[in-house]
């Protein structure tokens, strides 16, 4: 039995010969090397990282209850790549700060963030974590977690609905997919300069 191989029609070299753009591109690739392999690896690694984010929760109020609802069977955030919430910061990729953060809790939250491996992400959930909420004018409340941590995604609400939490988590996935893993994930520049100021 004879197997028929399809012929692949290629573009003749003569069509490329007089194209200045292609000649300049080939010259540039020959001089400086190519980043095609690194780009493909970036895409593959970011796909894996974005679809296997493990959250660490720092919940102090009603927003934490909504986060529990997202993890339950009705919403099931595991189907979007957010597996079981981790209890240790060393196993987590992102921290979800939900609820009022007091000045006394701020150093503990900062220590948890510092113990996470890079690259790490922060989601501020609810009005209390974003801006202090109804306790904003109180002397002991931190007016937003972004005073001590670099926040990647803000999810407003008091408390936000489970659908809003899922949407915010999916937005974080999109952000992770767009990052450059090789030479691009440097989060130190995004951190607040003086955490004691808060």
Curated annotation (Swiss-Prot):
The gene is nuoB. Pfam families: Oxidored_q6. NDH-1 shuttles electrons from NADH, via FMN and iron-sulfur (Fe-S) centers, to quinones in the respiratory chain. The immediate electron acceptor for the enzyme in this species is believed to be a menaquinone. Couples the redox reaction to proton translocation (for every two electrons transferred, four hydrogen ions are translocated across the cytoplasmic membrane), and thus conserves the redox energy in a proton gradient. Keywords: 4Fe-4S, Cell inner membrane, Cell membrane, Iron, Iron-sulfur, Membrane, Metal-binding, NAD, Quinone, Translocase, Transport. Belongs to the complex I 20 kDa subunit family. One of its GO terms (biological process) is aerobic respiration. It is found in: Cell inner membrane. GO terms for cellular component: plasma membrane; respiratory chain complex I. PANTHER family: NADH DEHYDROGENASE (PTHR11995), NADH DEHYDROGENASE [UBIQUINONE] IRON-SULFUR PROTEIN 7, MITOCHONDRIAL (PTHR11995:SF14). NDH-1 is composed of 14 different subunits. Subunits NuoB, C, D, E, F, and G constitute the peripheral sector of the complex. GO terms for molecular function: 4 iron, 4 sulfur cluster binding; iron ion binding; NADH dehydrogenase (ubiquinone) activity; NADH:ubiquinone reductase (non-electrogenic) activity; quinone binding. The keyword Mitochondrion does not apply. Binds 1 [4Fe-4S] cluster. It catalyses: a quinone + NADH + 5 H(+)(in) = a quinol + NAD(+) + 4 H(+)(out). Its cofactor is [4Fe-4S] cluster. It is an enzyme of class 7 (translocase). This is NADH-quinone oxidoreductase subunit B. Coiled coil: none annotated. The keyword Transport applies. [4Fe-4S] cluster binds at residues 62-63, 128, 158.
């Amino acid at each position: 039995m004879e197997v028929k191989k399809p012929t692949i029609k290629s573009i003749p070299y003569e069509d490329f010969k007089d194209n200045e753009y292609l000649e300049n591109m080939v010259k540039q690739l020959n001089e400086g090397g190519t980043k095609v392999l690194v780009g493909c690896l970036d895409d593959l690694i970011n796909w894996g990282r974005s679809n296997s984010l493990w959250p660490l929760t720092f919940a102090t109020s009603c927003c934490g209850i909504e986060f529990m609802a997202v993890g339950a069977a009705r919403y099931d955030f595991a189907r979007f790549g957010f597996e079981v919430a981790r209890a240790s910061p060393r196993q987590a990729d992102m921290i979800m700060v939900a609820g009022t953060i007091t000045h006394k809790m701020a150093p503990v939250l900062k220590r948890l963030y510092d113990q996470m491996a890079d690259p790490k992400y922060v989601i501020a959930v609810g009005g209390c974590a974003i801006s202090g909420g109804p306790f904003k004018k109180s002397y002991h409340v931190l007016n937003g977690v972004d005073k001590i941590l670099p926040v990647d995604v803000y999810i407003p609400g008091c408390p936000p609905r489970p659908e809003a939490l899922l949407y915010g988590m999916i937005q974080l996935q999109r952000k992770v997919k767009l990052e450059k893993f090789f030479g691009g994930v440097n989060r130190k520049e995004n951190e607040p300069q003086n955490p004691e100021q808060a």
